[in-house]
Amino acid sequence: MSNRELPVRPNLDQLKQQAKDLLHSIRGGDPSAVDELNHHHPEPPSPPEAKLADAQLVLARSYQASSWPRLVQAVQLVDAIWRDDIDTVRKLVTSNPKLLHEDALIRRNSNWGPPLTYAANLGRDEIIRMLYKLGAGDLESAIGRALLQGKIVTARMMATRGARDGCVLTAGALETA
């Protein structure tokens, strides 16, 4: 059974609809939906007795989240970074400091990384400063992502905070040559 991956900018309304659709498929006895229920649910109910909370848990775990609330939290965090909503980002990471160090998209091998790196991809400098002050430690991956996305001002700001990237060191040597 393969896992799902959140898109770069997930949509909570779409995930809610996916959960409802999954519940409908489970209750209807769709073999792949029932297999998913049995694979991802620790105590799967019989298909006719499945509730929305069961479908939400199955969906969350298929996205590699531990629970539906954790999946919702990830989507809210990513959405707040996209909207440059520093207050919502602060509220989410102070209520759950582990978020500072987990992949924002809850998927392994994501180039978007933890929230600081995710914000660097988008050039969200105020959010980066705030996350850094709160203890985010992924400056090296963040500076690399900022450079890849052409966010030079963001990369310079991170370099002043101690981030080092082979590209930055090379570029600095070239600027002085």
What are the residue ranges of the model-derived segments?
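Intrinsically disordered, low-complexity eukaryotic regions enriched in glycine, serine
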Residues: 1-91, 95, 118, 122
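Short glycine-/small-residue-rich flexible loop motifs, especially phosphate/cofactor-binding loops
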Residues: 57, 116, 128, 155
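Ankyrin-repeat boundary/"N-cap" motif
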Residues: 73-79, 101-118, 132, 137-148, ...
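Conserved ankyrin/ankyrin-like repeat signature
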Residues: 88, 126-127, 153-154
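Ankyrin repeat domain, specifically the short helix-to-loop turn at the C-terminus of the second helix
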Residues: 93-99, 129-137, 156-164
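Leucine-rich solenoid repeat scaffolds
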Residues: 143-159
